[in-house]
């Protein structure tokens, strides 16, 4: 079985994109989220989709439908380097184990330090062990 994220990361990097996340959904759907500095356009998604369709055919990767999209305004933070890249932005963390009787924390991301997510919540600096973060997303300012 091929490690698809490991196979796609260098391919997408060569095209100028970052693999944010990959998920397999029902009915053979393969959903791929990409990003690049300055954001992703529909033309970027089409170009990546066309490239990957050919790659998957050559490498005999099983899927029925391919969906390529941007991660959206509420982009998930999935890699440790995401926490440094988006320092200063507003984020929402969903915790595995509650802290201060809260399972969700929202505040300004300060970064990642020694496997701990640093953020300011309600004017107070907090440190959350990265292993306790179930999900993290940018919180778009509207």
Swiss-Prot record:
Location, primary (coarse class): cytoplasm
Pfam families: DUF150_C, RimP_N
Keyword Cell wall biogenesis/degradation: no
Subcellular compartments: Cytoplasm
Keywords: Cytoplasm, Ribosome biogenesis
Cellular component GO terms, alphabetical: cytosol
GO biological process, alphabetically ordered: ribosomal small subunit assembly; translation
Function: Required for maturation of 30S ribosomal subunits.
Family, as annotated: Belongs to the RimP family.
HAMAP family per record: RimP (MF_01077)
Name the UniProt record assigns to this protein: Ribosome maturation factor RimP
The organism of origin for this protein: Thiobacillus denitrificans (strain ATCC 25259 / T1)
Gene: rimP
């Amino acid at each position: 079985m091929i490690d698809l994220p490991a196979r796609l990361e260098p391919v997408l990097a060569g095209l100028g994109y970052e693999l944010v996340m990959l998920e397999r959904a029902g009915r053979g759907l393969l959903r791929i989220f990409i990003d690049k500095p300055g954001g992703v356009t529909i033309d970027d998604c089409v170009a990546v989709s066309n490239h990957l369709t050919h790659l998957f055919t050559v490498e005999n990767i099983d899927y029925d439908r391919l969906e390529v999209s941007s991660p959206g305004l509420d982009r998930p933070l999935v890699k440790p380097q995401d926490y440094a890249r988006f320092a200063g932005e507003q984020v929402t963390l969903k915790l595995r184990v509650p802290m201060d009787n809260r399972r969700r924390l929202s505040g300004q991301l300060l970064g990642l330090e020694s496997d701990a997510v640093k953020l300011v919540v309600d004017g107070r600096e907090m440190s959350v062990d990265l292993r306790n973060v179930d999900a993290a997303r940018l919180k778009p300012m509207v």
